[in-house]
Amino acid sequence: MSAIYNLEPQPTASAIIHTTQGEIAVELFAKQTPLTCRNFLQLALDGYYDNTIFHRLIPGFIVQGGDPSGTGHGGESIYDNGALSGDLDPWPMDQRRGKNAGPHGVNFKDEFHSRLKFNRRGLLGMANEGAPDTNSSQFFFTLGKADELTGKNTMFGRVAGDTIYNLAKIGEAEVEEGGERPLYPIKITRIEILINPFDDMQKREKKPRPQQISRPTPAEKKQKKRKGGKQLLSFGDEVGDEDGEELPLPKKPKFDTRIVADLDQDDSSKQSASKKSSAKRDAKPVANDVPKREEKPEPKPVKESRRSPSPQPVAQKKEQPPKKHYSEHSSPEPEEPKKKSLLEKTNEEIAALKASMKRTIHSEPVKQEKKKSALEQLIPDTAIRGRKRRPGASSNPTREEQEALDLLKSFKAKIETAPPEKNAAQPAVNPDVEDGEQDGQADEEKVCDLHFIANCQSCKAWDKVEDNEDSGDEGWMSHKLSFAADKLGKDLSYRKKAEEELVVIDPLAKARTLKEEKKATRDAKTGGSSRAWDRGRRDRH
């Protein structure tokens, strides 16, 4: 990384881009890219980038901004329309080519340098239109290595310090599906210039102000003309007082009142049609007489034409009710029911089809439908219901109780009459053993001829049932259960017996006794003393 910094030249300008995600400190290479840096710093000084957004984001590649419209299709440079093209300006006109040249030229040229390459993240470059020398105001930051941009886009700065992490956060924003626009774009609030190498740079005033001043002037003139016309139409009496020549103006309200009076008479009688036609005929020459007298002002016939449609909707509204009355008694009556009959027929056919479908499918359940209680609705359809009581059981409950008592008495009688239990079971007789062998060799077991094993289970016939087995024996019914009386628990003799049988051993006392026993055996061997001189004295005696 240090080698990369050694290759890049020393920056000569710096600024801080304040965003809603945090600050981004930028160092600019104004010596290597003077046109690009001047354009960026001048637009930042003018507040051109304030409240703009980063409208494009490609994760791991770039994040782009600098368009006031926020669409990616806007932006302008400080060199547009031949600005700064003098002989002493930074970009004279004789050095401009193509679309950059001329009084209507746009954008500015690319500035490439052999030591400025897009070889890592955090580098600042100018965005163009995909063609050479089409730079305007849009710029971008790299989010990774982008060698394909070297030689195509101008690199004029880099991110400095720990603010690179704020740029990384911007690069992690969510993007719309199938697009490159962030869901929640980050906004540039302002750009603060720290070091500006261009001493002659000053804040410019916005140009669209004179256009705004020039535009309203014709509109005001038009509005004044319209206002004058409206005054003539709506305030005719006042104008008549001021200008005595305009005599036909009072005739217009008279004409309007006549039309309204004629329309009121048309509602009351059927002869209104002839009166209306005559009133309209009279109205036309009156309207024609007004522009003839005042042929010079052209807007007057227009005003009359504007006036003329105003009473027409009133006449139409008042003419509609009699038309409806005529329609009720005239031929349109059968037309409406015809349309309704067609609709009714189609609706009836649809209803018949639905009814037929319901009959074929839901005919049986409709007949069997019964109202169910809340408890019955909780029972699932797959549940099996129990056997119902007999019809007379609820009315005569003593009958069932009597039957149960009779069954109990019969069972007791059967137990009393049961045969006694067999005390001793007869010994099982093996059919394979002969009678002579059972007498003399009862204790000996027979050896198998095949395996030579005594009492071989493989050669024994297990499927033969012994004769003494009796499955119908009822002797068990007379059996009685008898157990020895538990006296230990009642008189607490069990506890006393347990205390007597319990042996308590003290390990210290046991160890002491064992030690004494060992000592006694040792003394017995040595004659009662372990000393050699004592043993010798005892041997002499």
UniProtKB/Swiss-Prot annotation:
SUPFAM superfamilies per record: Cyclophilin-like
GO molecular function: peptidyl-prolyl cis-trans isomerase activity
Superkingdom of the organism of origin: Eukaryota
One GO CC term on file: catalytic step 2 spliceosome
Enzyme category, top tier: isomerase
Classification via InterPro entries: Cyclophilin-like_dom_sf (IPR029000), Cyclophilin-type_PPIase_CS (IPR020892), Cyclophilin-type_PPIase_dom (IPR002130), Cyclophilin_A-like (IPR044666)
Keywords recorded for this protein, A-Z: Cytoplasm, Isomerase, mRNA processing, mRNA splicing, Nucleus, Rotamase, Spliceosome
Domain PPIase cyclophilin-type: 11-193
Compositionally biased tracts (Acidic residues): 432-442
Coarse class of the protein's main subcellular location: cytoplasm
Entry EC no(s): 5.2.1.8
Localization, UniProt: Cytoplasm; Nucleus
GO BP: mRNA processing; protein folding; RNA splicing
Region entry Disordered, spans: 199-443, 513-541
Chain intervals with Basic and acidic residues compositional bias: 279-307, 316-348, 361-374, 513-525, 532-541
Catalytic activity line of the entry: [protein]-peptidylproline (omega=180) = [protein]-peptidylproline (omega=0)
Pfam families cross-referenced by the UniProt entry: Pro_isomerase (PF00160)
Subunit structure, interactors included: Associated with the spliceosome.
PANTHER family xref list: PEPTIDYL-PROLYL CIS-TRANS ISOMERASE-RELATED, SPLICEOSOME-ASSOCIATED PROTEIN CWC27 HOMOLOG
UniProt record similarity statement: Belongs to the cyclophilin-type PPIase family. CWC27 subfamily.
Functional summary from the UniProt entry: PPIases accelerate the folding of proteins. It catalyzes the cis-trans isomerization of proline imidic peptide bonds in oligopeptides. Involved in pre-mRNA splicing.
This protein's name: Peptidyl-prolyl isomerase cwc-27
Originating organism: Neurospora crassa (strain ATCC 24698 / 74-OR23-1A / CBS 708.71 / DSM 1257 / FGSC 987)
The organism's taxonomic lineage, starting at the top: Eukaryota, Fungi, Dikarya, Ascomycota, Pezizomycotina
